[in-house]
C-alpha cells in the first residue's frame, strides 16, 4: 500500500476511535497484513510530526522499563478528516478505515 493511503487509513481509524486512542501494538496488528511494521510506524510518526495525531508513552503495568505507546487523533486531524482543513498531499483520506 502506498504510504499516503496508509496514512489516510490510520488517520481514519483514529478518527473512528475518537475520543479514545489506540495502543501501538493494536495499530500494528490491524495493518500488518497489508504493510510491514516499519511502514506502519513511519506513517503514524509522520502523522504525529504533522500534528494530526499525538503520541503518549506510559510505563508498562507489568514489565519494568518498558513503555506502552498510544496514538490519538488531534483536532487538526479531525478537521482534515471532516474536510474542514486544507488537503494534505501526503495523506489520502479513505471513506472508511
Please describe what each predicted stretch is.
Residues 58-59:
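Solvent-exposed edge beta-strands and adjacent loop segments
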Residues 62-64:
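Short amphipathic alpha-helical segments that predominantly mediate membrane engagement
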Residues 67-97:
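Short, amphipathic alpha-helical interaction segments positioned at domain boundaries
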Amino acid at each position: 500500500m502506498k504510504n499516503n493511503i496508509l496514512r489516510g487509513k490510520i488517520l481514519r481509524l483514529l478518527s473512528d476511535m475518537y475520543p479514545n486512542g489506540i495502543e501501538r501494538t493494536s495499530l500494528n496488528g490491524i495493518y500488518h497484513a497489508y504493510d510491514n511494521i516499519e511502514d506502519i510506524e513511519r506513517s503514524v510518526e509522520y502523522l504525529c510530526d504533522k500534528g494530526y495525531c499525538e503520541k503518549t508513552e506510559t510505563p508498562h503495568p507489568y514489565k519494568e522499563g518498558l513503555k506502552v505507546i498510544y496514538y490519538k487523533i488531534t483536532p487538526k486531524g479531525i478537521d482534515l478528516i471532516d474536510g474542514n482543513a486544507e488537503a494534505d498531499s501526503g495523506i489520502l483520506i479513505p471513506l472508511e478505515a
